[in-house]
Amino acid sequence: MLLAAASLIAILTVLSNGASAGALDRIRQDRAIRIAYREDAPPFSYKNNIGEPAGFMVDLCRAVAKKLTQQLQMPNLSVVYVPVTAASRFAAIEQNKADLLCEPTSATLSRREQVDFSIPTYLDGASLMIRADGPRDLQAMAGREIGVLDNTTTEQMLRRTLKDAGITADVILTKTHAEGLALLDDGKIAAYFADRDILTSLINGSKAPEKLAVADNYLTVEPYALALAHGDEDFRLAVDRALSHIYRSGEIGPIFQQAFSGKAKPSPILQVLYVISGLPD
């Protein structure tokens, strides 16, 4: 009887270990890390003019992958890029199609029921992209159409903000930020709601940037982080260790400059974020 019980415990232990085998085991086996990225969310995660993944979050994940080569002692670790959309991004992590989600992902408590998050990677806030000849603030949007990307925390926050302010407006859902820009350019919506840095990038890449502007006020605060599989503590620790080294060593500066511009540097609040978030070994 005791032998049978011991055998059962041994079997359950093996099965438990197998079930909890996470990203690090797969990375070691395949000698590759799979990075999920968006094709339509500049300046954080997008496909550039020559069809390559680019943006701040993508560059940051490349730096994380480089740190993992040192942690795992795998100098030939390769990076595989997995394109995702705003709608499919979390499913890619949950269904084990990607190891790390590298795009402007807002870390929220409700999302932590689906995935785990790294230490913070960025801080942004949502606002309105408006036409220079149109209404310029949220109060002036009553009875008008406001575009927002579908299936995002930004959409939820827009609806909540309108409700709290007692403003009745039509919320127009878009599949991509580019679609929102086109609707605003064509006068089909009065404003487009998204994170400010994304809006600034959209304006810079538009056909007539002088006709567009970003409203002055922040309507939300969005802390970004890298998403990974729920419950994969070993991988999250490895990612957090990599990010902490990047923050504490100052490597985050060149990564930031490459993504935004040669002279750009993190804002004072971002600098504080990186100092606080970078954990010692």
Place the predicted regions along the sequence by residue.
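Extracytoplasmic small-molecule ligand-binding "clamshell" domains
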Residues: 25-101
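A ligand-binding cleft/hinge motif common to bilobed small-molecule-binding domains
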Residues: 88, 102-114, 157-164, 183-220, ...
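Beta->alpha turn/N-cap motifs
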Residues: 37-41, 82-87, 96-108, 149-153, ...
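Extended ligand-binding regions for polar small-molecule ligands
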Residues: 24, 58-67, 134-135, 139-153, ...
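Short helix-initiation/N-cap motifs at beta->coil->alpha
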Residues: 74-91, 133, 172-182, 220-222
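Ligand-binding cleft/hinge of the Venus flytrap
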Residues: 49, 62-78, 154-173, 203-208
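Bacterial N-terminal signal peptides
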Residues: 4-14
